[in-house]
């Protein structure tokens, strides 16, 4: 049984509240879970504690092999329970292949025009 530590949505419409739960990976988002190990209230102001974690139970489930989702891993990293690897994408923000070809073609056309102007 693959275990996940993930968010389960509660609250009402436009007022989300999430429980941090340990659940089987196959169960639905708000469905059956094994244990509730924390809560996250994104509606609280930033200066108030939004995340509440039961750290010893989370550590127990991590030792049992439960995998946290990306959002929960951010919370665990902030609490110092599990390290979140830094993401590295050196190509982010670079133009795509076709855009690079267009830029190269425009640069070549500008150089050709400059060379033609110099020889004339």
UniProtKB/Swiss-Prot annotation:
Domain of life according to the entry: Bacteria
Region (Disordered): 80-120
Record field: compositional bias (Basic residues): 81-90
Bias-annotated ranges (Basic and acidic residues): 91-101, 109-120
Assigned GO CC terms: cytoplasm; small ribosomal subunit
Stored InterPro entries: Ribosomal_bS16 (IPR000307), Ribosomal_bS16_dom_sf (IPR023803)
Keyword Ribosomal protein listed: yes
MF terms in GO: structural constituent of ribosome
This protein's UniProt keywords: Ribonucleoprotein, Ribosomal protein
GO BP terms in the entry: translation
Pfam family for this entry, one: Ribosomal_S16
Gene3D superfamilies per record: 3.30.1320.10
Family: Belongs to the bacterial ribosomal protein bS16 family.
HAMAP family in UniProt: Ribosomal_bS16 (MF_00385)
Protein name, UniProt field: Small ribosomal subunit protein bS16
Species of the source: Bartonella bacilliformis (strain ATCC 35685 / KC583 / Herrer 020/F12,63)
């Amino acid at each position: 049984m693959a275990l996940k530590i993930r968010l389960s949505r509660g609250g009402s419409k436009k007022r989300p509240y999430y429980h941090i739960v340990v659940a089987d990976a196959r169960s639905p988002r708000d469905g059956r879970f094994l244990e509730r190990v924390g809560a996250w209230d994104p509606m609280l102001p930033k200066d108030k504690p939004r995340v509440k974690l039961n750290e010893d139970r989370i550590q127990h489930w991590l030792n049992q092999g439960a995998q946290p989702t990306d959002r929960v891993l951010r919370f665990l990293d902030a609490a110092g329970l599990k390290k979140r690897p830094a993401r590295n994408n050196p190509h982010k923000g670079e133009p795509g292949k076709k855009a690079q070809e267009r830029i190269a073609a425009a640069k070549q056309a500008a150089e050709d025009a400059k060379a033609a102007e110099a020889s004339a």
